[in-house]
């Protein structure tokens, strides 16, 4: 079976925001 590439989520602890890399 083929798996979808898992999006890497980077969370910045300073701003408290998470963004996809």
Swiss-Prot record:
What keywords are annotated for this sequence in UniProt? Antibiotic, Antimicrobial, Disulfide bond, Fungicide, Immunity, Innate immunity, Secreted
Q: Which cysteines are joined by disulfide bonds?
A: 11-18
User: Where does it localize?
Assistant: Secreted
Superkingdom in the source lineage: Eukaryota
Q: Which residues form the signal peptide?
A: none
Q: Name one GO cellular component term.
A: extracellular region
Locate the transmembrane regions by residue number. none
Tell me the Gene Ontology biological-process terms attached to this UniProt entry: defense response to bacterium; defense response to fungus; innate immune response; killing of cells of another organism
Please quote what the entry notes about the protein's domains: Four regions are important for the activity: the C-terminal loop, the last three C-terminal residues, the stretch of seven N-terminal residues and residues 8-9 are necessary for the antifungal activity and dispensable for antibacterial activity.
Its function?
Insect defense peptide with a broad spectrum of activity against Gram-positive and Gram-negative bacteria and fungi. No activity against S.aureus. Stops respiration in bacteria but does not permeabilize their inner membranes.
Name of this chain's protein: Thanatin
């Amino acid at each position: 079976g083929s798996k979808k590439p898992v999006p890497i989520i980077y969370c910045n602890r300073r701003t408290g925001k998470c963004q996809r890399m």
